[in-house]
Amino acid sequence: MNTNIAAFSPDLPVHMTFEEHDWHLLAQYWYPIALARDITDQPTSSMLLDMPLVIYKMNDELVVAKDACPHRGVPLSLGKNDGQGVVCRYHGLRFGNEGKCNRIPAHPQHKISERFHLKTYAAVEKYGLIWCSLTADKDAEPNIPVMPYWNDADYQQLVCPQVDIKCFAGRQLEGFID
C-alpha cells in the first residue's frame, strides 16, 4: 500500500502550487483581492494564493468565500444574486449574509445543515480595495498597511488598475524583487 498519498484538506486550495508550509505562512497576511468599486451584490471571482474566491455584498455586508458551492463544487461566481443571496447555477442553493445557505430548492422544508454554509474569510474594504486574509480571525483587527494621508485632501489618492499576471505567485514575487 502506498503511504505517500497526501491527505486532503478542505482548507487548502485544490490546485495548490505552494508547499503546504509556505501556504500557511502566507495565508495569515492580508492581501488586496479586488477594487472596492467593482464589488456589488452580484458575485465576482478572485484568486488568492491559489484559492478561488467569490466576493459579493449582501445588505451592505461584504462576503468573501471559497468560490465553490458546498453541494457540488460549482463556482458561485457564475451565479446571480436574487436579492436574498447568491444562487448557484447548478441546483439553485442560495447563500446570503455571512455566506449562510438560506435555500435548498429540493428540500424547502428541511432545516439547513451547517455543512451547506460557505467557507468564508476575513475581509474588509479599505483604501478603495477589498482586503482578505485566508486564516485571520474575522473579529481581529486587520493587519493592513497604514496609509496616513489617504483621507487628506492635500494628497491625491490613486487606486491602480488590476493586472492579471498568468503565472504562479513565486514567479510574480521574483519579478517584483528585481
What are these regions (language model features)?
Residues M1-L62, D82, G96-D178:
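Rieske [2Fe-2S] iron-sulfur-binding subdomain
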Residues V64-L78, G83-G96:
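Local cysteine-cluster metal-coordination motifs and their immediate loop/turn environment
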